[in-house]
Amino acid sequence: MAGINGAGPSGAYFVGHTDPEPASGGAHGSSSGASSSNSPRLPAPPDAPASQARDRREMLLRARPLSRQTREWVAQGMPPTAEAGVPIRPQESAEAAAPQARAEERHTPEADAAASHVRTEGGRTPQALAGTSPRHTGAVPHANRIVQQLVDAGADLAGINTMIDNAMRRHAIALPSRTVQSILIEHFPHLLAGELISGSELATAFRAALRREVRQQEASAPPRTAARSSVRTPERSTVPPTSTESSSGSNQRTLLGRFAGLMTPNQRRPSSASNASASQRPVDRSPPRVNQVPTGANRVVMRNHGNNEADAALQGLAQQGVDMEDLRAALERHILHRRPIPMDIAYALQGVGIAPSIDTGESLMENPLMNLSVALHRALGPRPARAQAPRPAVPVAPATVSRRPDSARATRLQVIPAREDYENNVAYGVRLLSLNPGAGVRETVAAFVNNRYERQAVVADIRAALNLSKQFNKLRTVSKADAASNKPGFKDLADHPDDATQCLFGEELSLTSSVQQVIGLAGKATDMSESYSREANKDLVFMDMKKLAQFLAGKPEHPMTRETLNAENIAKYAFRIVP
């Protein structure tokens, strides 16, 4: 039957072949039913006898060279030409269509139900017949629900998308807030093991849905206009969101909610259609997140709340078996020198609900890691002074020996103590300079940095830290009594050994210490001719200026407002505490 493949829903034969015999109710069950061209006849009209349709169907089912489209047409009962012109999906094999044809011959209710089931099964794909669903079946709706949860929680979808891209490129990433993590872990239990960047169906569908939503948000974002209401309103901050991004939009629409928002820096309202249509006035309702430091009793309440959370987190970490000294060193390295926290400690911090990273746009004052570091120093106390025998200096080559200046680590340092775990190159270099009076910066750095190109960067950072520390004596002064009246007040370690003021970077402060430069850092700059004023400068945050210099060496940003802070303008923010 060379021409049988030409049969199908269109009811046509091979080009140029026609059936010279009219369709009739004669015997078509034998081989005489085919024309001399051996091509099947046109489908019978709807009012043709049922026996004719059965005979034609039996004939076609016995033909082996049937195409898949023809077998589907047969399984559907060979509908008329006009109905069969609808596009048809690929069907199962001819063996799956044969039971349907035999079932129609019996004309019993059970057979009719079975035939209907076969016709229903005929609309499925080969993957469905094999018992497997197509790719992403159910994964796309699931991924869309996850994205909607993030939108409802007010998450920064663009930031999450950037985090995923960085993770897939094996770059360093900043983990999202606890709210976002809880949503993602609900759907990706192995999130921390990299499930979000895996090739699973749900992860792939989620990344695609997230990118679509980010593009839609960018396309639908209204352009900023210069028109403003008569009341001056602050501009929206570009600071990325933090763990407080999950606060609901309904709180923002109430007076109490907006007041609470003022007390929570870096809070961003959720981007939803309801918020966009809430007001037609061109007023930006987000309070400014930059240069905003909580004042008065509110800041005391926030600090007490942070201390309580930090104490509870320390108990949880101790129950997990985390070494407290290792934790203190890891926190100091991360806060001061921006070095990543080790993975085992990071997982432990995740277990107690603390994100193991500090957002680059976030104030250190409200970060849980900072509260944890202060609580840890309070619990462990100052580090015991270790008596170390000074290592002998590297011998200097004789002057008569000809050598290139950088061909060896020649140094005249007399004291080179062991390096602490929490010290980076800048901190260690500054300590070596203090232990070796008269030594130069380049000479000191050459004693412990081998790479000559890295050496140049370390020298520049150390000089920046030293220049900042030299500004200490030029700062405006605040008496110890006035500092004590601050909220929270300054408490010298010599006077309050059990409740001394902690440095922003962890250590207890004392004016009698020979290695500390105690200052109060204001949140707002004022002219050098003005004395300290709580109304103008805001409340002070007390710290060691040497630690602040190390913090600013790599990235000169104000730890609270993220404005530029360096040796040129430190005197406008800092006040020296005097007895």
Curated annotation (Swiss-Prot):
Pfam families: AvrPtoB-E3_ubiq, AvrPtoB_bdg. Residues 1-140, 214-294, 384-408 are annotated as: Disordered. Unlike many effector proteins, it is widely conserved among diverse genera of plant pathogens including Xanthomonas, Erwinia and many strains of Pseudomonas. This is Effector protein HopAB3. Auto-ubiquitinated. Its main location: secreted. One of its GO terms (biological process) is symbiont-mediated perturbation of host programmed cell death. Residues 1-336 are annotated as: Host recognition. It comes from Pseudomonas syringae pv. tomato. The keyword Membrane does not apply. Residues 337-579 are annotated as: E3 ubiquitin-protein ligase. GO terms for cellular component: extracellular region. Interacts physically with plant cell Pto. The gene is hopAB3. InterPro entries: E3_ubiquit_lig_AvrPtoB, HopAB_BAK-bd, HopAB_BAK-bd_sf, HopAB_E3_ubiquit_lig_sf, HopAB_PID.
